[in-house]
Amino acid sequence: MGKSRRNKDENDSNFSQKKERVDENTINYYRRVTETLNEGFSTDEDRELFLDNVFNQLEEDGPKVCRLASTSRVLEKLILDAQDKNILQLLKAFSQDWIVLLSDRFGSHVLQKLICQIPRCLSKISNEEDTEDETIYTYFLNLCNFLKDNISDARTDVYASHILRVVLQVLGGVNVGEQVVRSRLSRNQDKDGQDEINMDNFSPSDKFKKVLLKFTKVILSSETLNMEICSATNNPLIQTVLLVLHKVNDQKCQKYLKKLLCIPGLFESNEESLPVIAKDEVGSFMVEQILNLCSGEFYTELYKKLFKGKLLLYAVHPVSNFILQRLITNVKEKEHFEEIFGELCGYLEDMLAVNHLGVVTRLAETCHRLGCNQEKLLRSLKAAFHCLEPVERETKVAPLLLSLTTYEIYYGMTDSDVKKEDETDKEPPKKDPVLTDINYHGSILLQHLLKFGNPKQMVTSLLELKPVELKNLACNPCGSHVVDAFFQSKTIGEKSREAFVNRIKGQYLDIACNKNGSRTLEMIWKHVNTSQKIAIATELGKQEHKIRGDRFGFFVHKNFGIFQFVQRRKDWEENLNANLKKRKLFEEILGVDSSGNKKKKGSSKSEDSQLKLEDSDDEEEAKTKKPVLYKRKLGYEQTIPGSKKQSKEYQLKDKKMKHLLNEVTGKKKKK
C-alpha cells in the first residue's frame, strides 16, 4: 500500500516524463559495445577510436538509452573511461532536456555518474572560465541553474534529490562520502555516486562557491523546513548542505545550525519529555549530524537545551539512544563528560536490561579517549555483571564481558545457590563453563578497557582463562580483536604479553590453521621478543607438514620462516636479528614506535591508535522495533525487565528508570 502511494506521489511530480520507445537495433548496438569493452583492445589508439565512435552515437541516442535498465549500465561503464571531450559530448546531449533524466530511475544514475567526473575534468585547467574547456564549466552551471529554478520539485523527488546532493559536493569541492547519517539499509542501497567523486587536485572557483551559498540559502530557508527535516528524501539533502558548508565556510555552517535549533515544534521539550525530532526515526539523524558539526561553544549550548537532566530519557528510548551515543562520542571537554558520566554511570545495568549496549560502549570509548572516570566505569560494569562482590568474583569479569552474561547465568547458578551464597558468604559449587561464543558488543567493550591507564584487573582476568578459551578467543571474528588490543595496548607490560604467549602453548597449531587465528598469530608475532618467537616457531616446527598444507597455516609457515627454522635454525636467527635491527633503524628515522604510531615530541609515550569500531547497535532494527531482550544470552524472559524474576538477571533496579521505560514503551500502570 505504502509503495504504490509513493510511486503515485512521484508520478505527480513536475519532473515525471514518459519514456521514449527505443528500437531493438539500438539496444543490440549497445549490447555489442559491452561485449567489445569486455574483450579489450590491442592498442590504446584502437580503444580511443572506438570510444569516440560510441560517444558520437550517444550525442543522438544518449537521452533515450540512458533511461533503459540494460543500456544505462553500459553508459555508466563508458563514462568511467571517458575523456574530457566525451564528457562534454554527453553534457551537451543531456542539457537539451535535464528534466528527462533528473527523475528517471536509471537516467538519474547515468547523470550522477557524469557529474562525478566533472571535478576530474576541471582540475586539469587553471581557470575554468577562460579556457577552451569552458563548455564543461558552463554546462554544469546550466544544470545548477535549472535545479535552483526547480528546487521545490528537485528536493522532493527521490532521484533528483540524489543529483542535487552530488551537485552540492562538486560546487564545494567536498566529498562527504558516508558522513551523511542514515539507516544501514539506505547506506547499503546507495553506494554509487557519492563515493566516486574524485576531488583530488580540484579547487572550486569563486563562482562555484557563490552558487553553493545560493543553494544553501534556498534549501535552509524553506518555510516547510520543520517537515522536510523529518522526510527521508529531504533529510540527507539538508545534511549534505551542512557537511559541505562545514568544509567551505564553517562560520556560516554554525549560523545555520543555530537557526535549525530555533525551528518551532521540533526542539521544544520539558523536563519529563524528549523533543519531537529526537523521537523521530528520520529527524533524529539530523540531531546526530548537528552534534557532529557543532563547535565547542555550540555543543555546550545544545547540551544545556536538549540533554541536561534528561539523559536517562534518551538512554531508554529505542531511537533517541543513538543521539545519546553521538553526544558522548563528540564530547571534548572533561568537565562535560564528568557531568554526562555522573548522570549515567549508576544505570549501566538498566541500559543492558533494555539492550542499549551502544551507550555503554560509547562511555567506555570516551573514558579511554579523555583519560577520566576509568576506575568508576570498571566498578560500575562489575556491579552490572554481578561480579563486584564477593571479591573472588572480580577475576571473572573478562568472560562475563565477552559472553555478555551475568555471573549467575554464566556459571549456571540457581535461585537457591544465590540465596545460600548470600547467607554463608561462600560460593557454592558451580559449573565450569568453557568460553566459546564471543559477543560483538562485549568484544568492543573489552577492547576499550584493555586500553585504559590501569588495565591490571582486565589483564589478570583474561590470563585466567583456560588455554582452549584463549584459543577460541583468538580464532573468533570478534574475539581476535580483543587479542589485538591486548598486545597493542601501551599500558600492558612485556611480562603480561609473555604470560599470554606462554598461556596458549600447545594451541599454536590450531590458531595458525584458522582464518582469524592465523591473522591474530601474525599480529602477536610482531609484538613479542626473540625468545618468544623461538618458542612459537619450535612448536609450529614440530607439525611443519600440517601447517604448510593448510590454506591459512600456509601464510604463517611462510611469514614465520618455519621451513628455515627447522632446517637451518642458525640462519633463521641471524635473519630475525637483522630484520629487528632494520626495523629499529626504520622506526628511529620515521619517529614511530614499534606499533607504527608517531611519537610525540618531548614525550616517550605515543598516542593510542584508535580501533576502527562500528556503531554498536543496529540502527535500522532498533529504530523500527521495540526493545527486545537477548533471551538466549542474557537470560531475559520478559519484554520489560524488572519484574519479580530472580536477581541473577540484569534488572531495572531504579524506580525512576522503570517509570521512564513505561512511558517510552507506552505502558501505563493499572490503577
Model-derived features: where do they sit?
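Eukaryotic gene-expression regulator signature that favors modular helical reader/repeat domains
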Residues: 1-671
